[in-house]
Amino acid sequence: KIGSEYICDGKAFKIVSIKEAIKCDDGNSIILITAIDYRSIYNQLSVYGYDMQRCISIDEIARNQLEISNYSDVIYESKDKLIPKKIHYAWFGKEKPDLIKKNIEHWKELCPDYEFYEWNDTNYDITKNKYMKEAYESKIWGFVSDYMRLDIIYKYGGIYLDTDIEMIKKPDELLYQKCFASFDATFVMNLGSGFGAVAGMDIIKELRDYYDTVSFVNKDGTYNKTSCNSHSYNVMKKYGVKVNDRLQNVHGMNIYPMIFQGACGHTNTIHVTNKTFWIHYGNLSWMTRELKNEQ
């Protein structure tokens, strides 16, 4: 990619080598690393003798933010429960590991009065969206549910959880609002970290329909592994979402700070307070095994 440009929010950024970037440094610059594999970049910078005091990764910032992340209270929009007591989750690919099975059983123990729905290729039409179908046929399971979970919540209402979420407390108090989600350590909303809504919520439909405009398989045959966070941000930014880890309502959706889900996945950091409903461990099934092993 060196020599090409990366387009972000309509701005073009030239991609250069680390050596060239250091040459452009006038001594007043700070390098902010946004890549997941920030440790490797640190190593490369140190080889060139770069002043590491002027270098930091967004993941380390997120780790520090998680320690102070907070919000006043869960929002109540009604005296009556609005979101139905339904918990949805998805599983594609091989048989669920025992750890995942035990985790789901733990949900059921905490929420005996909830209805649980497992969605997979036997009870859901994965061909109804091109992006989802391409991810399924490519066996890149971590992307298959991105469209599906929005479609399910829009149609039936309830709460969606990724299977690598450990529930800390029963989510009853979350049911008195029309729609909720949370930020994660990327400082933007992550629907994989759990979200809920009443059926027919407009913002859920818009987030779902966005996937009709993108493909998972690029024209050159490579995979479009843009995260669901980035896809969601493309929708939410036009409604004024702020990247600040603060509780905010965006087009009817209450988005809670990252402490709501208690984890900074890229640094393997967990922090739980009385404001944490569950921990999203983020097994990052969409990330290559090689990079996960390095971390």
Predicted regions and their residues:
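Active-site flanking residues adjacent to catalytic metal/cofactor-binding acidic residues
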Residues: K1, L161-T163
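A solvent-exposed beta-alpha-beta segment
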Residues: K1-E60
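Feature targets compositionally biased, intrinsically disordered low-complexity regions
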Residues: I2, D9, D26, Y156-G157, ...
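Structural motif
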Residues: S29-I30, K86, I159
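Flexible, charged surface loops at secondary-structure boundaries
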Residues: A21-N28, D80-L82, I152-Y154, V272-T273
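Small-residue hinge/turn detector
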Residues: D146-G158
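Glycosyltransferase-associated regions of secretory-pathway enzymes
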Residues: T34-S145, T163-Q295
